[in-house]
């Protein structure tokens, strides 16, 4: 079976790396949750505040190759470019705008491409979206009924770029008094132990400090 995953990151933007790694992390965690006979090789827990979706990042299509058996077709020869995810069809062509038959929410700044009946690809960015009506930044020649793909989702990109993605390790903390001062032990989930002692004089606190100590030590992340 597979022991590692190679994620293409050369010359890719931060949003691509964030989205793709979060997607695979999510899928791996789903497998580990239902397979008690498997465990991950790394430690920690990844947290992200967006829903990863591979179709939102640069890709040249997807294939299962021979994973589920032999296939007649394994590649698309339509274009080497990233056409994005299908969202609908061109409903009406106006002088400065297009009406798209779609259930998706369209955003100012989105990028699209339209594939016509002759497999010609017309790509464009929009300045404005009002409902399902989009206003391209430049004039485009597309026909009614053409398949519309979105290859740049402005809102999704903003969400990924401003996300607080992090990886946290579970730590057990023990703080206790010694004859000469105090001692602090931290045990990471991978078994590593860090211990620090401090020699100092002691004075009785005017107020109980247990809750304050717990609060301060909980600020590790």
What are these model-predicted stretches?
Residues 1-221:
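Surface-exposed amphipathic alpha-helical tracts and adjacent flexible/coil segments at the periphery
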């Amino acid at each position: 079976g597979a022991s590692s995953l190679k994620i293409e990151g050369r010359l890719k933007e931060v949003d691509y790396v964030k989205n793709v790694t979060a997607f695979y992390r999510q899928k791996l965690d789903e497998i580990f949750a239902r397979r008690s006979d498997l465990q991950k090789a790394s430690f920690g827990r990844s947290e992200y505040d967006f829903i990863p979706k591979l179709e939102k990042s640069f890709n040249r299509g997807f294939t299962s190759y021979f994973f589920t058996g032999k296939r007649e077709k394994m590649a698309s020869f339509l274009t080497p470019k990233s056409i994005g995810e299908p969202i609908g069809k061109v409903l009406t062509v106006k002088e400065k705008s297009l009406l798209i038959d779609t259930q998706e929410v369209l955003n100012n700044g989105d990028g699209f491409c339209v594939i016509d009946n002759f497999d010609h690809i017309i790509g464009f960015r929009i300045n404005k979206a009002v409902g399902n009506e989009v206003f391209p930044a430049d004039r485009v020649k597309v026909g009614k009924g053409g398949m519309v793909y979105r290859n740049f989702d402005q809102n999704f990109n903003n969400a990924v770029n401003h996300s607080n993605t992090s990886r946290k390790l579970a730590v057990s903390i023990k703080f206790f008094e010694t004859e000469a001062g105090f001692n602090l032990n931290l045990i990471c989930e991978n078994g590593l132990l860090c211990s620090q002692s401090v020699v100092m004089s002691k004075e009785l606190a005017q107020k109980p400090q247990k809750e304050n100590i717990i609060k301060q030590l909980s600020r590790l992340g």
